[in-house]
């Protein structure tokens, strides 16, 4: 006499999740393990399907969504430095990159893609040590034993990729510094950043920037440049006098202040005229006289 085989539930990754009683299936409830496999497989597929974007917009979207793995200057999955816009687009749209992303996801799962960071206690630290003997995230390699892992970490390939990763950090910092210098991306006077040249142009002809320019010229006229840079102060926050450690609310107040006796007393090294003449060195005071010697 033949008996029917126990029912099985197929997991989303194609493998059988194991036998379960027919009552569980009839109730329409999946065991927790199967639900987890289905959810994980769905999320994994969504990430993998977007591993090979097409066009600039999709590439930028992928970088923004997965900044822990991809940047404008480095692909951390492939350990590749991207020194130009064309190289960046070509790399992220390549089949080779997509295959490495799939392999990376198979090893590390979804946590790295989401940028999740976990606080490690002593147990987790020991787990990390075990993971190190199983795979190398820098070189995207897996090992069959701790001996093979140790051999890899002492080899030339790992040393080369590690050096490449360290250099990429410097390239990113240099890229950020260049953006700070580029007037189409950053206004050092107002501490404002821009996404495109059109936005930058609108800022430079705007009221806020012109006000800051007026402030800068005024302070230069009254000898303020002898103090630390005016740009140290937040944009639009009054008219600061670092010498006296006060902030004036208007141009008129600032003019009156720098022309006054109190401000000049606080500036023993220079005397600036209200007409904006070049600051002159004050001679030593003798017999309570404030007369300057020629």
UniProtKB/Swiss-Prot annotation:
Residues 1-32, 262-294 are annotated as: Disordered. One of its GO terms (cellular component) is nucleus. It holds the Pfam family zf-met. The keyword Repeat applies. Residues 267-276, 283-294 have a biased composition (Polar residues). A zinc finger (Matrin-type) spans 70-104, 131-165, 182-216, 236-270. InterPro entries: Matrin/U1-like-C_Znf_C2H2 (IPR003604), ZN346_ZMAT4 (IPR051868), Znf_C2H2_sf (IPR036236), Znf_C2H2_type (IPR013087). The modification N-acetylmethionine is found at residue 1. Zn(2+) 1 binds at residues 75, 78, 91, 97. The zinc-finger domains are required for binding to dsRNA, and also for nuclear localization. Forms a heteromeric complex with XPO5 and ILF3. Found in a nuclear export complex with XPO5, RAN, ILF3, ZNF346 and double-stranded RNA. Interacts with XPO5. Interacts with ILF3 in an RNA-independent manner. This is Zinc finger protein 346. The lineage of its organism: Eukaryota, Metazoa, Chordata, Craniata, Vertebrata. The gene is ZNF346.
């Amino acid at each position: 006499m033949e008996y029917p085989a126990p029912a099985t539930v197929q997991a989303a990754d194609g493998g059988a999740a194991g036998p379960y009683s027919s009552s569980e299936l009839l109730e329409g409830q999946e065991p927790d393990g199967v639900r987890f496999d289905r959810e994980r497989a769905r999320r994994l597929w969504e990430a993998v399907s977007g591993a090979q974007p097409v066009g600039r917009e999709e590439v930028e979207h992928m970088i923004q969504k997965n900044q822990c793995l991809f940047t404008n200057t480095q692909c951390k999955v492939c350990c590749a430095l991207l020194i130009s816009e064309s190289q960046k687009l070509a790399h992220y749209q390549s089949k080779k990159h997509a295959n490495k992303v799939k392999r990376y996801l198979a090893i590390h799962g979804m946590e790295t893609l989401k940028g999740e960071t976990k606080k490690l206690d002593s147990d987790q630290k020991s787990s990390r040590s075990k993971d190190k003997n199983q795979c190398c995230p820098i070189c995207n390699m897996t090992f069959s034993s701790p001996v093979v892992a140790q051999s890899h970490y002492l080899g030339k390939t790992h040393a080369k990729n590690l050096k490449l990763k360290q250099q990429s950090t410097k390239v990113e910092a240099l890229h950020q510094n260049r953006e700070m210098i580029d007037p189409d991306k950053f206004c050092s006077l107002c501490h404002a950043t821009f996404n495109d040249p059109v936005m930058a142009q609108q800022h430079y002809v705007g009221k806020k920037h012109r006000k800051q320019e007026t402030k800068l010229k005024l302070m230069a006229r009254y000898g303020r440049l002898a103090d630390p840079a005016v740009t140290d102060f937040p944009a639009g926050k009054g008219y600061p006098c670092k010498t006296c450690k006060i902030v004036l609310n208007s141009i008129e107040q600032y003019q009156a202040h720098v022309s006054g006796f109190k401000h000049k007393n606080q500036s023993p090294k220079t005397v600036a005229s209200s007409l904006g003449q070049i600051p002159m060195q004050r001679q030593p005071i003798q017999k309570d006289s404030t007369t300057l010697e020629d």
